[in-house]
């Protein structure tokens, strides 16, 4: 009888630990909520506008000049197939939303030589900045708690974060998030 009771306690302990682990994992996967996020205001977006990056040719990129616009920031790399897959859609959206004061910025977490060679084969019509490791640091500051790419952040004209997106964008999700950013 005593062995049976001990066995039940061990089973209960294992069940409790399993439930605790599941709750912890699920809470980490919650959807971004603008209303309660500490990663939303100008103090956070200032990190983007103040960042110092260059383009693939080594010329400084003036991100501060984008203040007052709706900015779609996509963190990517040349070695990331999902990143490369969504680039034509971003080029099309840059053209479609240009007159609505929307600017797309791709920040490559890569080396300048790799980005330069990539862009010669796969040109885009939006701003590309080369960030290397500091690109990952900026993406973390903008809410990328998974340190994953592609990762996209939208900042509205009032410098508030309106959406964060992990993984590849669908056209439908991109348009929905742009509509929200332009309100």
Segments from the language model and where they lie:
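N-terminal targeting signals for export/organelle localization
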Residues: 1-50, 54, 163, 179, ...
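Active-site acidic short loop of glycosyltransferases
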Residues: 66-69, 99, 125
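Surface-exposed loop and edge beta-strand positions of immunoglobulin-like domains
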Residues: 54, 64, 105-107, 166
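Thiol/disulfide oxidoreductase modules built on the thioredoxin-like
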Residues: 120-124, 131-179
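Short active-site neighborhood of thiol/selenol oxidoreductases, capturing the structured segment around
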Residues: 62-81
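Structural microenvironment flanking redox-active thiols in thiol-disulfide oxidoreductases
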Residues: 84-123, 133-139
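Active-site-proximal beta-strand/loop segments in catalytic clefts of secreted hydrolases
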Residues: 75-76, 107-110, 131-132, 168
């Amino acid at each position: 009888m005593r062995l049976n009771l001990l066995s039940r306690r061990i089973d209960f302990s294992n069940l409790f630990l399993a439930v605790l682990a599941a709750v912890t994992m699920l809470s980490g996967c919650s959807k971004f909520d603008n209303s309660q996020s500490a990663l939303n205001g100008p103090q956070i977006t200032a990190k983007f506008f103040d960042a110092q990056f260059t383009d693939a040719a080594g010329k400084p990129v003036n991100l501060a000049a984008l203040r007052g616009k709706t900015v779609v920031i996509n963190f990517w790399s040349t070695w990331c197939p999902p990143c490369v897959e969504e680039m034509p859609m971003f080029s099309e959206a840059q053209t479609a939303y240009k007159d609505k004061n929307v600017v797309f910025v791709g920040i490559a977490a890569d080396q300048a030589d790799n980005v330069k060679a990539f862009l010669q084969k796969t040109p885009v019509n939006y701003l590309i900045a080369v960030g290397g490791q500091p690109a990952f640091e900026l993406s973390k500051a903008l809410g990328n708690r998974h340190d994953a790419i592609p990762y996209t952040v939208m900042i509205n004209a009032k410098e508030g974060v309106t959406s964060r997106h992990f993984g590849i964008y669908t056209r439908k999700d991109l348009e929905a998030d742009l509509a929200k950013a332009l309100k």
